[in-house]
Amino acid sequence: MKKVLWIIIIILMVGALAGCGANGQPITAETEGIWNHFFVYPLSWVLISVADLLNGSFGLSIIVVTIGIRLFLLPLMIKQQKSSRAMQALRPEMEALQKKYGQGTKRDPKDQQKMQKELMALYKDSGVNPMAGCLPLFIQLPVMMAFYFAIMRTEVIALHSFLWFDLGSPDPLYILPVVAGITTFLQVKMTSFQLNDQMKVIIYIMPVMIVVAGVTLPSALSLYWVVGNLFMIIQTYFTVVRFEQLKTDISK
């Protein structure tokens, strides 16, 4: 639950930073603001430069740059997943401590301190840093949000088309939003075993939100979501699902 709280805090921080300069105006080298100058514009420039190399295809540019960013962030994602697995391995002992000292508001302040002390000792003995899984998010989220704004605010993208859709308009056939929703569902579902029961509702909420957004926002964003989701599905299979399968086979 604390990890989820940190994620929310990070999103709010990045959103506040973005709000200082991301007013929806087209992004250029002259656009002012730290967020614009150091995050959004560089990615906008990369999108335009890659499109120039691909005969002016901004659709292919979005695909290539999305994959490039995901590859760049891959080591951080792997580190985060290793941390999650380490915390998951400690879950039985952590739950035993919670049971030992009582739950939530029923817990005496002194018992709370004792439990925290034992938890810290458990982390230290196991070589686990409970914050290690959150640290990569401080890098990943700003980059992915900056890329989102770069797509939205690179004015020239809206003037181009790709396959059957205009990048600056919603998909008229609703194919991209639906595919984005399906791939989002598959991606979250593949790691649902890591979620507690209260958080599993996100499996169904996120895809619906993506579909609704995809129906109203430019197709360039839906394309970005689809490509990013497909990359994450492949990554998750090899770094999480396949790992769990091998671990199960070894235990047999």
Swiss-Prot record:
It comes from the Bacteria. Pfam families: 60KD_IMP (PF02096). The keyword Transit peptide does not apply. CDD domains: 5TM_YidC_Alb3. Residues 1-19 form the signal peptide. GO terms for biological process: protein insertion into membrane; protein transport. Keywords: Cell membrane, Chaperone, Lipoprotein, Membrane, Palmitate, Protein transport, Signal, Transmembrane, Transmembrane helix, Transport. The chain crosses the membrane at residues 34-54, 58-78, 131-151, 162-182, 201-221, 223-243. GO terms for cellular component: plasma membrane. It is a multi-pass membrane protein. Disulfide bonds: none annotated. A lipid is attached at residue 20 (S-diacylglycerol cysteine). It is found in: Cell membrane. A lipid is attached at residue 20 (N-palmitoyl cysteine). One of its GO terms (molecular function) is membrane insertase activity. Its main location: membrane. Belongs to the OXA1/ALB3/YidC family. Type 2 subfamily. Required for the insertion and/or proper folding and/or complex formation of integral membrane proteins into the membrane. Involved in integration of membrane proteins that insert both dependently and independently of the Sec translocase complex, as well as at least some lipoproteins. This is Membrane protein insertase YidC. The lineage of its organism: Bacteria, Bacillati, Bacillota, Bacilli, Bacillales. The gene is yidC.
